[in-house]
Amino acid sequence: SGSCSLKTCWLQLADFRKVGDLLKEKYDSAAAMKITRKGKLELVNSRFNPPTPDDLVYLDQSPDYCVKNKSTGSLGTMGRLCNKTSEGMDGCELMCCGRGYDQFKTVQVERCHCKF
């Protein structure tokens, strides 16, 4: 008949939030590795299952982002404002790294340009 069917596949990135959540999940469950004398990677803690090709692994511990560190450029979290009622990244428990925090109340006056 001279006709043919065409299929077009489109590749697109997943939602940015989903990508970030997946990376954070992998970061949190990354496997600590060490290099043996023979130059091979080995789990630091042999009680864990060996990592799969999809798992993240690391050789060096991440720096403590709670504390100021000039060599890594981390400013730490001391003195930053946090949200007492939030359980997210801006929450005081997480941001203050369990060190406690000062509480204060503020009154913020803003012009709302309301029309009645």
Swiss-Prot record:
Presence of the UniProt keyword Transmembrane in the record: no
Glycosylation sites recorded in the entry for this protein: N69, N83
Keywords: Developmental protein, Disulfide bond, Extracellular matrix, Glycoprotein, Lipoprotein, Secreted, Wnt signaling pathway
Reported modifications of this chain: Palmitoleoylation is required for efficient binding to frizzled receptors. Depalmitoleoylation leads to Wnt signaling pathway inhibition.
Source organism of the structure: Alopias vulpinus (Common thresher shark)
Name of the protein described by the UniProt record: Protein Wnt-5b
Chief subcellular location: secreted
Gene Ontology MF, one: cytokine activity
GO cellular component: extracellular space
Function field: Ligand for members of the frizzled family of seven transmembrane receptors. Probable developmental protein. May be a signaling molecule which affects the development of discrete regions of tissues. Is likely to signal over only few cell diameters.
Subcellular location: Secreted, Extracellular space, Extracellular matrix
Lipidation, O-palmitoleoyl serine type: S1
Disulfide bonds: C82-C97
Keyword Disulfide bond: yes
Biological process, per Gene Ontology: canonical Wnt signaling pathway; cell fate commitment; muscle cell differentiation; neuron differentiation; positive regulation of convergent extension involved in gastrulation; positive regulation of non-canonical Wnt signaling pathway
Family in the record: Belongs to the Wnt family.
